[in-house]
């Protein structure tokens, strides 16, 4: 009898007491800094545009968060994006591609890795395209290529600057050659912006790599980057394994690339909006009219 009583106390009463006094704590209440290990209350991080106070480490942002941060009053018009065939290659690795797409859409609430918005930034009409790394690593596929081109067409139609926030691991392997085709297609779209004399600015965020770096991310009139962003074609680990040498400290980080002339400026996230508005304002000014050549008067005989 005594044994049964003890079992009842240990198996039934104690767990109920623990549950009664247990305080529910959401898993995402605190954010850990990847650099210092510092724990920061999530509301502080959100209020600081997802930059860790103290270490100034720039966390990744969703496309929605990025657009809200950039546009005046946090309001903009979503640009409708074209629909593309889903999984035309019927690709499967460990998992079917269509299932990977379903999971990514459920996780992010997006149809693919790109969002395009039109609105005002610092009072200037502007078209912004944002890649979301949370959607299959921001990989470039048919949908992303179509979205980039539609953003460029919107900028052409409305005569606005086109600003891209790049965040990608590269081309989407599940779409094979159809993914690689987006590299020349996006390059042609950038060329059309150049011909129309409209500014195209690229902001490289962490990470910007692979086929995205080999195409539209490196074709801007001005290249900006967030602090500490990884930027390159192949990652540093792959390069080290290939050349069998240790890479320099900070190799492929935005500060290193700035020192070596690959990008124009490293800009803290809090200064991005003002910097982009200022640059676009300068670039959109019409060139001064050249003075008309006066017809030479005939010399007296």
UniProtKB/Swiss-Prot annotation:
Biological or metabolic pathway of the protein: Lipid metabolism; malonyl-CoA biosynthesis; malonyl-CoA from acetyl-CoA: step 1/1
Location(s) in or outside the cell: Cytoplasm
Gene Ontology MF annotations: acetyl-CoA carboxylase activity; ATP binding; carboxyl- or carbamoyltransferase activity
SUPFAM superfamilies for the chain: ClpP/crotonase (SSF52096)
Domain of life of the native organism: Bacteria
EC number: 2.1.3.15
Keywords on record: ATP-binding, Cytoplasm, Fatty acid biosynthesis, Fatty acid metabolism, Lipid biosynthesis, Lipid metabolism, Nucleotide-binding, Transferase
Catalytic activity: N(6)-carboxybiotinyl-L-lysyl-[protein] + acetyl-CoA = N(6)-biotinyl-L-lysyl-[protein] + malonyl-CoA
Main subcellular localisation: cytoplasm
Enzyme class, broadest EC rank: transferase
UniProt xrefs under PANTHER family: ACETYL-COENZYME A CARBOXYLASE CARBOXYL TRANSFERASE SUBUNIT BETA, CHLOROPLASTIC
Assembly notes: Acetyl-CoA carboxylase is a heterohexamer composed of biotin carboxyl carrier protein (AccB), biotin carboxylase (AccC) and two subunits each of ACCase subunit alpha (AccA) and ACCase subunit beta (AccD).
Name assigned to this protein: Acetyl-coenzyme A carboxylase carboxyl transferase subunit beta
């Amino acid at each position: 009898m005594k044994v049964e009583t003890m079992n009842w106390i240990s198996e039934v009463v104690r767990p109920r007491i623990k549950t009664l006094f247990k305080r529910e704590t959401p898993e995402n209440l605190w954010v850990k800094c990847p650099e210092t290990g510092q724990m920061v209350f999530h509301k502080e991080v959100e209020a600081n545009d997802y930059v860790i106070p103290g270490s100034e480490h720039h966390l990744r942002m969703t496309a929605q968060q990025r657009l809200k941060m950039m546009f005046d009053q946090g309001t903009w018009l979503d640009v409708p994006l074209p629909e593309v065939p889903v999984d035309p290659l019927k690709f499967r690795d460990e998992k079917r591609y269509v299932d990977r797409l379903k999971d990514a859409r459920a996780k992010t609430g997006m149809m693919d890795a790109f969002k395009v918005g039109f609105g005002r930034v610092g009072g200037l009409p502007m078209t912004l395209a944002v890649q979301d790394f949370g959607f299959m690593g921001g990989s470039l596929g048919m949908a992303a290529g179509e979205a980039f081109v539609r953003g460029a067409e919107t900028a052409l139609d409305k005569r606005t600057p086109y600003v891209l926030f790049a965040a990608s691991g590269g081309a989407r392997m599940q779409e094979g050659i159809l993914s690689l085709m987006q590299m020349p297609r996006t390059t042609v779209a950038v060329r059309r912006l150049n011909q129309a004399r409209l500014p195209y600015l690229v902001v490289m965020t962490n990470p910007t790599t692979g086929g995205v770096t080999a195409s539209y991310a490196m074709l801007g009139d001005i290249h900006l980057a967030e602090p500490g962003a990884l930027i390159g074609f192949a990652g540093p680990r792959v390069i080290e394994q290939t050349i069998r040498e240790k890479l320099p400290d900070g190799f492929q980080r935005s500060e290193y690339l700035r020192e070596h002339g690959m990008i124009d400026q490293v800009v803290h996230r809090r200064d991005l909006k003002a910097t982009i508005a200022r640059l676009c304002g300068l670039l959109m000014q019409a060139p001064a009219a050249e003075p008309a050549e006066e017809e030479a008067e005939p010399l007296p005989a």
